[in-house]
């Protein structure tokens, strides 16, 4: 059976043709793309295929190899394009070797920023004949050698900022005859070599953020005659005589050429002031200015720029007090009279510099232009670096800030000095939020409305000097959280309220000199890191340490000169605080004005105890040697001064003689003091010991002299009358037969002791016999003695006579029964019979009485007196009229060694061993050989003068 195919319809045929056409189109597109890619790779090179994206625009290829981790240039190959920009920033290149760019002849811009390049070897840029811009910013370069940039003869733009460059060799830019823009900001340059720019046609130079203090005219500035933009900010400029040439040169170039300010860092009297505000007399007050001035120059011109005469943006400066005493209001600025003012036009880069071809890199330094609106009465210029507008309205007789029309757009700096402004209102700066500097000096401002600066959050410098402000309050500075420099000198300020500076925590410089301040509130500087404070020329008599001076922990310089300081107790704490400041911190000496004795005297030179004689105690902690360093902004150790409730010192400890003492001297001094103390202590110890020994020796010798002054000898003979010489210290062996007794005078008048003139002590041997003798010995209640008087003896019957073994002379007869009476009455003398001083019954000792030598002292005769009756003369000792007037009896008791001393008859008896009694009977036991000699001396009477001399001698003793 035959089956035929179904007929093909028109619709199906159309569908097939469309499908086939789509396949062909897709195949063609793929083929074209492949061919195109192959052609691109073949045209741009491998760098655009594998490593980096490439983009061609306006006949220029941009090769973006940024942040690819490239360590060496061997990892990439040069693109195959006539002109290209090679961007290699953000990689890891550390060194550039010779001839590494020899095949990159088409490069016109080379970005090598943000790598870690430390060295560029000679010939590294060979082959870059067409390079016009080179970026080496944010690397680690330290040196630019003479041959660093060899091969870059056509270079126009060089950026090497944010490195560590401290040295530039003199010919480093000598071959760069086309260089116009040089950016060297934020390095470590402290100076530039002479003739560095001699063959370089620079028009833009950025030297911000280095360590430059001077820029000489000869050899440097004289070769920069084509500069149209210069940036010198953030350098520690030394505003001295050497900077006069820079000031003259800046005045000779275009007013708009200087971008930013040249702010003085030193000296302190000019710190924080712009160079164009400082007169030459202030820069060089003691030398001839003409020696430092720049030589006259012809007006300079720069292609493509309209030049105007420099407008002086002067602010009346505080004159140096070292030359003359400044008036109440400072003089006007030193702007040259009749100097024409020409309003400068905004600067636009000329086309012949080729900036339009620099691409995005030119935006690194400049931005798109902004509308320029300037008040009619002022002159303005645009600061290209930050597109800030500088508005100069100096000396325009402006009475109100509201008169400035039209309002300037985004002003960065406004100079309104030398006008007639009296009030600053809240609405005056509503549209100036980006303001960095506001100069209102030398007006007539007497009132500033609360929060008038509330919208100026970016303001860093505020000049209110030379006005009529009388009071400062916290509301005045509200909103100025970024303020760093505040100038309030030459006003009428009498009062500063507590917390005035709380809204300005970043304040570093405060000038309050030449006002009428008498006191500062407690805590006025709390929370601040002030580096420089000027209080010169006020009415301070003292400043408390607590709450004021102790909060100034970061000071670099402070000026307290020209105040009527009252050098009394109130300034003791301040003086001690000043003495602990480091050298150079205090500007000029603090001079006393009162009291009169200290007038015109340096406070440091006066000892603290002289300032405050009636001091109590002031405790000051001495700074450690590390505090000699320049204070930082962190809180350092502050002097601890103990003060009273008023904040003034309570008194004084020890005055310090110097503001600082080297550590070595301090250690040596302490060592010497320690050694001296040891020697002094040893000497005192030896002296005390010698005195103690001497006292003991004197006491012993005195006792010996008291005993030996009675030349008495005692002898005890054994049985049978055996002889032996007696001795005062001889021991008694046994009792023998009675020996003959001899009554003798004292032998010589000097052997008696006169009556004492007074009591020496309570010791009985030094007590007088006047008055009740028994009462004189009441302290000796523990001793037992007995006494009896002559009257008692006379009432007793005489004993029977006893025949002695040897017949003595009549004067030497012993009374019968004497031994028995001695047993009962213990040593009775004609005047008194004093018993032996015996110990207590419970402390009996077989040792004989040690005080036996004090008994038996001579007794005055009752019938012969040498002193007339009724005479006022002192009673002198009595002497016997004849030897026969004496009756002898033994006045001591001899006992065997084994016998004990017996107690006395009662406690009421006299208990006194007589020492200072008048001469009386002396009972001795002479030996046989001395008997005749002793007998011969019985008839000797002493001379009266000898007696008187002896009494005087003992009175002195």
Curated annotation (Swiss-Prot):
**Major subcellular site:** membrane
Which residues form the LRR repeats? 82-103, 106-127, 130-151, 154-175, 178-199, 201-222, 410-431, 434-455, 458-479, 482-503, 506-527, 529-550
Annotated signal peptide: 1-40
Composition bias of kind Pro residues appears in 796-811
| Biological processes annotated in GO | adult behavior; axonogenesis; chemical synaptic transmission; circulatory system development; dendrite morphogenesis; grooming behavior; positive regulation of synapse assembly; regulation of trans-synaptic signaling by BDNF, modulating synaptic transmission
- Segments of this protein annotated with the region Disordered: 317-358, 623-642, 789-844
Query: InterPro entries, per this entry?
Result: Cys-rich_flank_reg_C (IPR000483), Leu-rich_rpt (IPR001611), Leu-rich_rpt_typical-subtyp (IPR003591), LRR_dom_sf (IPR032675)
Tissue-by-tissue expression: In the adult, significant expression is detected only in the brain. In the embryo, expressed in the subventricular zone, cortical plate, pyramidal layer of hippocampus, thalamus and hypothalamus.
Localization (cell): Membrane
Mode of membrane association: Single-pass type I membrane protein
Q: Which residues lie on this side of the membrane: Cytoplasmic?
A: 686-957
Protein's UniProt name = SLIT and NTRK-like protein 5
| Species of the source | Mus musculus
């Amino acid at each position: 059976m035959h089956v035929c195919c179904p007929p093909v319809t028109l619709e199906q045929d159309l569908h097939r043709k469309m499908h086939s056409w789509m396949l062909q189109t897709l195949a063609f597109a793929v083929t074209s793309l492949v061919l195109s890619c192959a052609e691109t790779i073949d045209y741009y090179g491998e760098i655009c295929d594998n490593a980096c994206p490439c983009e061609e625009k306006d006949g220029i290829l941009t090769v973006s190899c940024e942040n690819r981790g490239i360590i060496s240039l061997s990892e990439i190959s040069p693109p195959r394009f006539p002109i290209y920009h090679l961007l290699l920033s953000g990689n890891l290149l550390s060194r550039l070797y010779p001839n590494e760019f020899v095949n990159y002849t088409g490069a016109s811009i080379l970005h090598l920023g943000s790598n870690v390049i430390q060295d560029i070897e000679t010939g590294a840029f060979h082959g870059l004949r067409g390079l016009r811009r080179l970026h080496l910013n944010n690397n680690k370069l330290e040196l630019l050698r003479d041959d660093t940039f060899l091969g870059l003869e056509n270079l126009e733009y060089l950026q090497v900022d944010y490195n560590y460059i401290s040295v530039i060799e003199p010919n480093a830019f000598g071959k760069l005859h086309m260089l116009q823009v040089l950016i060297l900001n934020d390095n470590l340059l402290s100076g530039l070599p002479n003739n560095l720019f001699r063959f370089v046609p620079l028009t833009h130079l950025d030297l911000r953020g280095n360590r430059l203090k001077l820029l000489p005219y000869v050899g440097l500035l004289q070769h920069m005659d084509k500069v149209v933009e210069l940036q010198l900010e953030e350098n520690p400029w030394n505003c001295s005589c050497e900077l006069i040439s820079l000031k003259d040169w800046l005045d000779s170039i275009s007013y708009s050429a200087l971008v930013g300010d040249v702010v003085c860092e030193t000296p302190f009297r000019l710190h924080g002031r712009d160079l164009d505000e400082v007169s030459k007399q202030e820069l060089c007050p003691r030398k001839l200015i003409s020696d430092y001035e720049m030589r006259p120059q012809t007006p300079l011109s720069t292609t493509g720029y309209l030049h105007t005469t420099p407008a002086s943006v002067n602010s009346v400066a505080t004159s140096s007090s070292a030359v003359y005493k400044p008036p109440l209001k400072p003089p006007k600025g030193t702007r040259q009279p009749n100097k024409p003012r020409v309003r400068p036009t905004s600067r636009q880069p000329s086309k012949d510099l080729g900036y339009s071809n620099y691409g995005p890199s030119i935006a690194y330094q400049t931005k798109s232009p902004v509308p320029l609106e300037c008040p009619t009465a002022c002159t303005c210029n645009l600061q290209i670096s930050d597109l800030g507008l500088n508005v100069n309205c100096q000396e325009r007789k402006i009475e109100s800030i509201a008169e400035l029309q039209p309002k300037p757009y985004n002003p960065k700096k406004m100079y309104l000095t030398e006008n007639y402004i009296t009030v600053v209102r809240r609405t005056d700066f509503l549209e100036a939020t980006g303001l960095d500097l506001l100069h209102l000096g030398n007006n007539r401002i007497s009132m500033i409305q609360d929060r008038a600066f509330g919208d100026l959050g970016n303001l860093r410098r505020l000049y209110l000097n030379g006005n009529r402000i009388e009071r400062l309050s916290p509301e005045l500075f509200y909103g100025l959280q970024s303020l760093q420099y505040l100038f309030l000198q030459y006003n009428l300020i009498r009062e500063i309220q507590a917390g005035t500076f709380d809204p300005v925590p970043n304040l570093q410089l405060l000038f309050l000199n030449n006002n009428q301040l008498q006191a500062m509130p407690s805590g006025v500087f709390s929370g601040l890191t002030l580096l420089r404070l000027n209080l010169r020329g006020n009415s301070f008599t003292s400043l408390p340490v607590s709450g004021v001076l102790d909060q100034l922990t970061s000071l670099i310089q402070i000026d307290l000169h020209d105040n009527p300081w009252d050098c009394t107790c109130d300034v003791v704490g301040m003086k001690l605080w000043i003495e602990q400041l480091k050298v150079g911190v205090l500007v000029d000496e603090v001079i006393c004005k009162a009291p009169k004795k200290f007038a015109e005297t340096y406070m440091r030179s006066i000892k603290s105890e002289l300032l405050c004689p009636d001091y109590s105690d002031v405790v000051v902690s001495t700074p450690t040697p590390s505090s000699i360093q320049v204070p930082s902004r962190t809180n350092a150790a502050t002097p601890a001064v103990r003060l009273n409730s008023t904040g003034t010192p309570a008194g004084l400890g020890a005055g310090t003689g110097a503001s600082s003492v080297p550590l070595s001297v301090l250690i040596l001094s302490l060592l010497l003091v320690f050694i001296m103390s040891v020697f002094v202590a040893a000497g005192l110890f030896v002296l005390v010991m010698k005195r103690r020994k001497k006292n003991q020796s004197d006491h012993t010798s005195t006792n010996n002299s008291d005993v030996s002054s009675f030349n008495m000898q005692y002898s005890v003979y054994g049985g049978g009358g055996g002889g032996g010489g007696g001795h005062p210290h001889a021991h008694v062996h046994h009792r023998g037969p009675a020996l003959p007794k001899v009554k003798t005078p004292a032998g010589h008048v000097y052997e008696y002791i006169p009556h004492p003139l007074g009591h020496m002590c309570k010791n009985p041997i030094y007590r007088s016999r006047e008055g009740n003798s028994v009462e004189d010995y009441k302290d000796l209640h523990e001793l037992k003695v007995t006494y009896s008087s002559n009257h008692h003896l006379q009432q007793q019957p005489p004993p029977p006579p006893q025949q002695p073994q040897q017949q003595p002379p009549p004067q030497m007869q012993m009374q019968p029964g004497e031994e028995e009476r001695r047993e009962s009455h213990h040593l009775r003398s004609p005047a008194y019979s004093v018993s032996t001083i015996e110990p207590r019954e419970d402390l009996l000792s077989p040792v004989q009485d040690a005080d036996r030598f004090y008994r038996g002292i001579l007794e005055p005769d009752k019938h012969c007196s040498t002193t007339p009756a009724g005479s006022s003369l002192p009673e002198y000792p009595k002497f016997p009229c004849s030897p026969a007037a004496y009756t002898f009896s033994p006045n001591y008791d001899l006992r065997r060694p084994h016998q004990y001393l017996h107690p006395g008859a009662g406690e009421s008896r006299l208990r006194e061993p007589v020492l200072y009694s008048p001469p009386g009977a002396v009972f001795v036991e002479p030996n046989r050989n001395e008997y005749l000699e002793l007998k011969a001396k019985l008839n000797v009477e002493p001379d009266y003068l000898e007696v008187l001399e002896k009494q005087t001698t003992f009175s002195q003793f």
